[in-house]
Amino acid sequence: YLLIILGLLLGKLNSKAISPFYTNHTNFKQLTIQDGLKDNTVLSIHKDSKGIMWLGTSTGLSKYDGNHFTNYTLDQYFSMNVRKIEEDSRHILYLQTNDWITYMDCKDENTGRLHTLVKNKDYQVTDFLLLNDSTLFACDNQTLSSFRIMLDQNGHPFSKLEKVYPFEMAKGERFMKFCITNNHRKIYLVTNSARVLLLEISTGRVLKQKRLLTTKHEFGASSVVCHNGKLFISSMLHGIFIMDTSLENLSHIANQQNIFPTHLSHNDVYNIIPISDSSILATTWYGYTMLLADNNIPGGWTTEIRTSEPTWQSLNFEARMISSYYDPHGFLWIGTHGGGVLVSDWKWNFIKQYQRRQCSRKHHY
């Protein structure tokens, strides 16, 4: 009966009722260049449809099958940092490398540059998103563009410009990150001056916009996620901003210096990912923070900060965490600056906590 109960509970890891994060210490395994990783600075992480892990580093791409690494330089002339990885249904990876897009066909491991041309010039990509096998959105400093993806006679992708969305931008203002709504009808774009724009794809109209804060300096948008009716925006200077998808009811979570307790491990937030309907993980320059929906306050959030774990001390690295990936099967991957990648099996943490609760109840009885 215990195994049946545990199976049912583990099946709910992503449900609203149960968060897979717990206050007990979490064990991590570290993988570095000594294990075969191409570089110890890991900028992006992706698990493909075959179960293979792909790690984008500051000098190229690494493939990890659970036992061994295979490394790819991607270009014979340039040192390629891989900041984002997306995959289509044909097992083709699209990589944000420097300021352009590179593809990797996993079937034959052929790589090449996906030329995204606007007015016969290569698009200077600051962010991109693969909508489906045939449509890719990308933004540069001033515009958003959609490209049609097709395959050549060898089955490798190439692109053709479909539409350019122009915007009125202030002097020095530029786009940094964007995301798309679940129904694929609208896009949220974030600029370096902390402005958020809500764009309707079919008409190209800006439906709404909001200023997150007033600043004369760079906002430093690092990621934007639309999840469970909320929009999450992280900044490498100002922490995390949360609001409704209508751009209303703004909340700001930050590290309050010299104030205890604080709400964030560090204001330099490099990445945010959903863990469940009610929990978000933020990786920062100093550890990571879990954001948990507050059951007592509608629309409220509580945070749990991790800046030190027993296993981190034995791994001998600084907790500079800059990327993350959560596998729904229970594995958390965190990329670091200079410390390789950390891996933790969170489902076993859940089982151990469940067993402790059962023992506690028996003792109470």
Regions found by a protein language model. Name each.
Residues 1-365:
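Carboxylate-rich, polar loop motifs that coordinate divalent cations or form catalytic acidic clusters
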